[in-house]
């Protein structure tokens, strides 16, 4: 399940650091968070879908690695992103 193009472009605009920014950690984390949030209802309805759950866990761990990278390089940007996305910590 992919993020819709319109929704994806809105997320990129909201979290981009510049006009053509699509690869900064903030944008990547925001896109992963959007995909994770879209998949959550699927797993509540389909608890035995272990194949897709593996993909979800990969996305969660990738988001965690990006957040760790951002935290080690710029703690202020990390805190702002966590607050803006409503993630824990």
Curated annotation (Swiss-Prot):
GO biological process terms on file: translation
* Keyword check for Ribonucleoprotein: yes
UniProt keyword annotation of Zinc-finger present: no
Q: Which GO terms describe its molecular function?
A: rRNA binding; structural constituent of ribosome
Q: What are the boundaries of the signal sequence?
A: none
Q: Single GO cellular component annotation?
A: cytosolic small ribosomal subunit
Q: Which Pfam families match?
A: Ribosomal_S15
Q: List, alphabetically, the CDD domains matched.
A: Ribosomal_S15p_S13e (cd00353)
| Job description of the protein | One of the primary rRNA binding proteins, it binds directly to 16S rRNA where it helps nucleate assembly of the platform of the 30S subunit by binding and bridging several RNA helices of the 16S rRNA.
Instruction: Identify this protein by name.
Output: Small ribosomal subunit protein uS15
Organism whose genome encodes this protein: Cupriavidus pinatubonensis (strain JMP 134 / LMG 1197) (Cupriavidus necator (strain JMP 134))
Write the gene name.
rpsO
């Amino acid at each position: 399940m992919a993020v819709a193009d319109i929704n994806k472009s809105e997320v990129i605009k909201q979290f981009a650091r510049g006009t053509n920014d699509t690869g900064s950690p903030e944008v990547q984390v925001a896109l992963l968070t959007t995909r994770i949030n879209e998949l959550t209802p699927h797993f509540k309805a389909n608890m035995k879908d272990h194949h897709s759950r593996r993909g979800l866990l990969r996305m969660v761990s990738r988001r965690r690695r990006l957040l760790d990278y951002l935290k080690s390089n710029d703690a202020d940007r990390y805190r702002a992103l966590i607050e803006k996305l409503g993630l824990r910590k």
